[in-house]
């Protein structure tokens, strides 16, 4: 322990803002006679005196990096959505806070009464992503003189939501966009949707297969769907040959090759020679020979490979595509009827806006560089081998759907750092009860403060706290005295300009349900307040969810941060303005998160809102609103029977009321009230209700769905809506 101030001249005046009690013989201290000492952190001091604008928030949260071209901050300090990307006109931008208010306001105020958490989908962004992907490949094909075309395939595992898949088929029908399935239910889904799509769109059948899966894929072929059965295992070939002959269907076969090329990040584990999927070169040769012996070598038409999701650089991409193109050319040489090369997934998303090649959260390229690299690598190998250029496919699901949905949730409360205030008498009494070592720490803390040795103050404060904790464990200090120690240590940290403690913001969310990849693989997503961005965030915090699990928190953020800049909550939670609410948004989570979410603590999925750009006063129309699963829904998912549970509880309530000493009329009212309360609990979502006036069961009168045909969006809200109180346009069936 540093020998500081064991004997200090009492005449030495303390620094501004300090006065510590030495012992009971000294006069009572003054608390903050002249304010706290100036912070030694000049950067913080400078920042706190500057004007804050939406541009500052945009830079602070890197919104222009990860959000471009779909998300920005408007002049009101709200997140603004550009549904058509760079082609969005100023009057077409959608204020996300207004969408949230439309969703959550009570129905009698023109809202939909939906409960949080809430996923907001923007099909216009989905359309723009598809068109952008097709456009960059079309440009690469044309500019490089490539003699075939590109046609994409959407892997439905990324997001199997009905409207998402149907939108992709509809938006992509003009350029032969197809679907990929990896299981029997996904195959059924894809078959049904592609009946309304392009007849040239591919139906790629991946995943492990049994006889039923293969039979179903061949049925799809009979239904004139452009179906390709991709061999993941060598053993699947025998089933394909046998069943296709029995069904008298000539199959189109693909095979997945295990490449030597792989990347070292988390998502590269499915690639390389030891990857989970695909055939080795030895197995490929055997497959070719068996097909030739069966007179079906012409059926082999597609080569599939997958370097891994989130390919970090175009150099690695070119290496992998070049290797696959060599295999493709060898299959042509061996007599296969090759037509397609399927690059699989890998087109990455820049989650943190850094355009870095060294992180799973970013990639060092854009759409155009990706497309140009793929086309160039295939063309180079095929030209050298004098092989006809194949149709290029990719399964870029993450790149297609990540941007189109935003998860919105509320911060309902936060931990406070308010210290216990002690009078001079209480402080003297506290010091007298300390043991000798703790009292020495307190005196040394006082001396260090008087000398202005602020770093040493922190050291002695920590030692004092630890010794007092030990005294408390031994029963020598009571809980009020331990709280006083915490108060003194907090006082020291604040007074000397030490960094403010990180607060915990409690959010109305389940990490396990809505952000499972953060819990499972530390995947980071940009999280930002969707409003108040014209105000300076004054605290830093981590996010803690509703589950009874220590893993139910988000304490890592993009940019390598362990906390997030946040705004102060009001005394009752929320953000003070905007009706006292404080809303946060998680962006770029449109791929995988909904499909992977579980039911930990029986918290179900979020409410869902589908929003399209329109010519209405607020620039949007709600085309579909679905309340999240109720308590009854999640109980039913775990094999409980909510109806029987309700009857059991209602019977118990009836017994309770019957045995109560009330008038018969009052008993009837009491029973009705209890039964109604129980029914409401089953019908409500499992999450917190932060506004008792809102309608929690938005589906009560309409079976759970608000919807309209997309054609009806055109012209919706054409009526005058100048007044802010006027109902925002939406369609309700």
Swiss-Prot record:
A Gene Ontology cellular-component term: chloroplast
**Without the gene, what phenotype results?**
Reduced alkaloids and nicotin levels associated with a lower putrescine production. Occasionally, an early senescence and a lower viability of the older leaves is observed.
Spell out the residues of the site Stacks against the aromatic ring of pyridoxal phosphate and stabilizes reaction intermediates: 306
Q: Which reaction does it catalyse?
A: L-arginine + H(+) = agmatine + CO2
Q: Which InterPro entries match?
A: Ala_racemase/Decarboxylase_C, Arg_decrbxlase, De-COase2_CS, De-COase2_N, De-COase2_pyr-phos_BS, Orn/DAP/Arg_de-COase, PLP-binding_barrel
Q: Which NCBIfam families does this one have?
A: PRK05354.1 (NF003763), speA (TIGR01273)
In Swiss-Prot or TrEMBL terms, this protein is called Arginine decarboxylase 1A, chloroplastic
- In its UniProt entry, the species of origin is given as Nicotiana tabacum
Q: What is the lineage of its organism?
A: Eukaryota, Viridiplantae, Streptophyta, Embryophyta, Tracheophyta
């Amino acid at each position: 322990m540093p020998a500081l101030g064991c004997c200090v001249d009492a005449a030495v005046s303390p620094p501004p803002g300090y006065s510590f009690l030495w012992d009971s013989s000294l006069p009572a201290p003054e608390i903050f006679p002249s304010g706290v000492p100036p912070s030694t952190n000049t950067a913080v001091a400078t920042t706190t005196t500057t004007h804050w604008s939406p541009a500052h928030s945009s830079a602070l949260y890197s919104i222009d990096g990860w959000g471009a071209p779909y998300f920005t901050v408007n002049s009101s300090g709200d997140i603004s959505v550009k549904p058509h990307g760079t082609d969005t006109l100023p009057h077409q931008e959608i204020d996300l806070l207004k969408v949230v208010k439309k969703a959550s306001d009570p129905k009698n105020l023109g809202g939909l009464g939906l409960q949080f958490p809430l996923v907001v989908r923007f099909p216009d962004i989905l359309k723009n992503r598809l068109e952008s992907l097709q456009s960059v490949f079309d440009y690469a094909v044309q500019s490089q003189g490539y003699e075939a075309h590109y046609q994409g395939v959407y892997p439905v595992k990324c997001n199997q939501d009905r409207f998402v898949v149907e939108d992709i088929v509809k938006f992509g029908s003009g350029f032969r966009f197809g679907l990929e399935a990896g299981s029997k239910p996904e195959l059924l889904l894809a078959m049904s949707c592609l009946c309304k799509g392009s007849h040239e769109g591919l139906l790629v059948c991946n995943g492990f297969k049994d006889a039923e899966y293969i039979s179903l894929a061949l049925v799809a072929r009979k239904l004139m769907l452009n179906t390709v059965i991709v061999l993941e295992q060598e053993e699947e070939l025998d089933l394909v040959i046998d069943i296709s002959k029995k069904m008298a269907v000539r199959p189109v076969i693909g095979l997945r090759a295990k490449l030597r090329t792989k990347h070292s990040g988390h998502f590269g584990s499915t690639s390389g020679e030891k990857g989970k999927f695909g055939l080795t070169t030895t197995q490929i040769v055997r497959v070719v020979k068996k097909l030739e012996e069966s007179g079906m070598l012409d059926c082999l038409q597609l080569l599939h490979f997958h370097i891994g999701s989130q390919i970090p650089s175009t150099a690695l991409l070119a290496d992998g595509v070049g290797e696959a193109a060599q295999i493709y050319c060898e299959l042509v040489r061996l007599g296969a009827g090759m037509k397609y090369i399927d690059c699989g997934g890998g087109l990455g998303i820049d989650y943190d806006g850094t355009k870095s090649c060294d992180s799973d959260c970013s990639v060092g390229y854009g759409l155009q560089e990706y497309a140009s690299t793929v086309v160039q690598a295939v063309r180079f190998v095929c030209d050298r081998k004098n092989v006809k250029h194949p149709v290029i496919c990719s399964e870029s699901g993450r790149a297609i759907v990540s941007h189109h949905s935003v998860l919105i949730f509320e911060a309902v409360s936060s931990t406070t750092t308010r210290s216990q205030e002690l009078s001079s008498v209480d402080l003297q009494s506290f010091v007298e009860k300390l043991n000798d070592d703790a009292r020495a720490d307190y005196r040394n803390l006082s001396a260090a403060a008087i000398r202005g040795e602020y770093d040493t103050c922190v050291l002695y404060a920590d030692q004092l706290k630890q010794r007092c904790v030990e005294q408390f464990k031994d029963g020598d200090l009571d809980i009020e005295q331990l709280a006083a120690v915490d108060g003194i240590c907090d006082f020291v940290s604040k007074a000397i300009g030490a960094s403010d403690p990180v607060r915990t913001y409690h959010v109305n969310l389940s990490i396990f349900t809505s952000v499972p990849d953060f819990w499972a693989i530390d995947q980071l997503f940009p999280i930002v307040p969707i409003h108040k961005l014209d105000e300076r965030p004054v605290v830093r915090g981590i996010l803690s969810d509703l589950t009874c699990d220590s893993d139910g928190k988000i304490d890592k953020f993009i940019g390598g941060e362990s906390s997030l800049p946040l705004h102060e909550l009001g005394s009752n939670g929320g953000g003070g303005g905007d009706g006292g609410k404080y809303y946060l948004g998680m962006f770029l989570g449109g791929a995988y998160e909904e499909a992977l979410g579980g039911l930990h603590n029986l918290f179900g999925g979020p409410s869902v809102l589908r929003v399209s750009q329109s010519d209405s006063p607020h620039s949007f129309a709600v085309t579909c609103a679905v309340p999240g699963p109720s308590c009854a829904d999640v109980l039913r998912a775990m094999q409980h029977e909510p109806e029987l549970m309700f009857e059991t509880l209602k019977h118990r309530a009836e017994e309770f009321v019957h045995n109560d000493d009330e008038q018969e009329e009052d008993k009837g009212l009491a029973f009705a009230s209890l039964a109604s309360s129980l029914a409401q609990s089953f019908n409500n979502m499992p999450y917190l209700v932060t506004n008792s006036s809102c309608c929690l069961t938005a589906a009560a009168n309409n079976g759970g769905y608000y919807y309209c045909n997309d054609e009806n969006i055109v012209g919706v809200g054409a009526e005058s809506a100048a007044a802010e109180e006027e109902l925002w346009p939406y369609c309700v069936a």
